[in-house]
Amino acid sequence: MLPFVQNIPMISIWLCVLGGLCCLMLRAHAAKILSLLMCCTQVVLSAVILTHTLYAGASFNYQMGHFASPFGNELRAGPLEALLALCISVVMLLSLMGGADDLKLDIPENKRSNYYIMTSLVFAALLVIIYTNDIFTAYVFIEIITLGACAIIAIKPGGRTLVATMWYLIMSLIGAGLLLFSISMLYGVTGHLLMPGLYESVAVLAATGQYTLPLFILTGLMCAGLGIKCALFPFHSWLPGAHASATTASSSILSGLVVKGYIFLIIKIFVRVYGIQVMDMLHITDILLILGVFGLLFGFSSSY
């Protein structure tokens, strides 16, 4: 039997899902209280995992179901994952608390419970992206984030909000298509979806020189897909409209959590799927450096 602390990642995810389902049956004020209590509980649970992993000095895997790796699915929790989960929980709590007054002005009372349902689903999906050890599971919950993010934008009445939501949805679907295509290509050349298996297979392919061109192409598609979803340069122009049209709490969640969740997934894939040596061999780091410099110059020139 696993120690209780190793069950916390799964408990945290299901807590958000169940909290969202409970909000479906509650009035606006009760749904707000439940969401805030859920966020506070997540802060405590994430702090427990962080303390445990720091003192243990190692991460742990949580096997989902009866099938072990590489056939089953699993979660992975270490100090970095626990710290990010703690930060996400705190930001979500502060966003809902800070934007509570504006929600009363921007959203009709009969729709506010729906708002808290969507924020709970976004919260759960972000935790899955942090903890998952499976790249396809990350893709599935990225789409849940997309649907939840569109909902918390569109729930504010107004034509401008609907236009911004449609732009957000269209660009997110383009990014999702590129990401799914790259994941299917990666599965085709490696035969794995779990990150440890992908890391070993990619290292072998890089060492033997096999599938170098497909590996380079799928990496570019993956970066482009996630870059579009998190509005990295040069795919940034569509995002400000969505943030400006949303309510205060939604804008805070989108900019402080959703975008950062995609960026964390990019870093996670680079480190735990490719590794620094393979990235250097494929010149991915050089391309990222060039794009970063151009983004810096573009941002500097656009500020005037």
Name each region found by the language model.
Residues 14-16, 43-44, 144-146, 228-234:
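Amphipathic repeat-derived elements
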Residues 65-67, 72, 144, 173, ...:
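Short linear sequence elements within intrinsically disordered, low-complexity coil regions
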Residues 12-16, 35-38, 88, 119, ...:
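Residue-level recognition of transmembrane alpha-helices
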Residues 1-21, 129-149, 212-220:
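Alpha-helical transmembrane segments and their immediate interhelical/interface regions
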Residues 84, 114-115, 143, 287-291:
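Short acidic-aromatic active-site loops that bind/stabilize oxyanions
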Residues 1-11, 18, 22-117, 196-203:
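Transmembrane helix-loop-helix hairpins at membrane boundaries of multipass inner-membrane proteins
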Residues 94-104, 121-136, 148-304:
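Hydrophobic transmembrane alpha-helices and their helix-loop junctions in integral membrane proteins
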Residues 14-29, 147-163:
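Cytoplasmic juxtamembrane interface segments
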